[in-house]
């Protein structure tokens, strides 16, 4: 007969059925995962009506090659509660020197390239260390040719300059600015009217004011440049010659 008496020296074996038991951690994780999926589905359904709308991408980061032409770098003092004009397009001698360098050296334009858009890019830097303020900017794209802009204006509804203290303005006219082709021949044939007839006829000529939200007079390093978005076409002839091409 079997001996059912209790003896501490004899161990006992228990067999557990794990079919009805689950790990507590996995139960909590699965519950959170299901909750997250339900919230995600509800959020997507809420945003479904937005599929009928289109959002324009930043053309500055779009396809094409950006060619930068630095117009000038200079230091200017800006007094509190005021904004100063930083770009004056009436200097013919200044434009002559700039555009000569632009076409001949730093910006080689050929006939198989197309200028799709022009950006005015303004970089601002404080010259004095340990200064804590933000840059302000205000611009207008269209103005009468006979209008003489003021050198200094009061701050009225400005916008803060964004990341990296860079203020970028698209000069393309509404409806897609007219692309410029054969720009080198236009420059060669009529230089005196090149800027006014070619560039400003197809793109806006802006006026820009810069200021700060500081309560003191600040010294600012300003770099103004034009960035041309160039579209390149496939060449007619292969780039390489040889038995493999």
Curated annotation (Swiss-Prot):
GO terms for cellular component: viral occlusion body. Coiled coil: none annotated. The keyword Zinc-finger does not apply. Keywords: Viral occlusion body. The keyword Methyltransferase does not apply. GO terms for molecular function: structural molecule activity. It holds the Pfam family Polyhedrin. InterPro entries: Polyhedrin. Belongs to the polyhedrin family. Major component of the virus occlusion bodies, which are large proteinaceous structures (polyhedra), that protect the virus from the outside environment for extended periods until they are ingested by insect larvae. This is Polyhedrin. It comes from Hyphantria cunea nuclear polyhedrosis virus (HcNPV). The gene is PH.
């Amino acid at each position: 007969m079997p001996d059912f008496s209790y003896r501490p020296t004899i161990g006992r074996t228990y067999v557990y059925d794990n079919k009805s038991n689950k790990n507590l951690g996995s139960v909590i994780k699965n519950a959170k995962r299901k909750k997250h999926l339900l919230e995600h589905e509800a959020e997507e359904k809420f945003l479904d009506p937005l599929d009928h709308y289109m959002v324009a991408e930043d053309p500055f980061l779009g396809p094409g090659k950006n060619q930068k032409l630095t117009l000038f770098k200079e230091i200017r003092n800006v007094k509190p509660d005021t904004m100063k004009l930083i770009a004056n397009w009436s200097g013919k001698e200044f434009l002559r020197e700039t555009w000569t360098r632009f076409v001949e050296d730093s910006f080689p334009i050929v006939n198989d390239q197309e200028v799709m858009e022009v950006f005015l890019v303004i970089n601002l830097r404080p010259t004095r260390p340990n200064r804590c303020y933000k840059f302000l900017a205000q611009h207008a794209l269209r103005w009468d040719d006979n209008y003489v802009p003021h050198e200094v204006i009061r701050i009225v509804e400005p916008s803060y300059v964004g990341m990296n203290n860079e203020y970028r303005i698209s000069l393309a006219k509404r409806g897609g600015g007219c692309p410029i082709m054969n720009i080198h021949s236009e420059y060669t044939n009529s230089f005196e009217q090149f800027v006014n007839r070619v560039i400003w006829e197809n793109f806006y000529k802006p006026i820009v004011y810069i200021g700060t939200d500081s309560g003191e007079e600040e010294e600012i390093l300003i770099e103004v440049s034009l960035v041309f978005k160039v579209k390149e076409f496939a060449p007619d002839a292969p780039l390489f010659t040889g038995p493999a091409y």
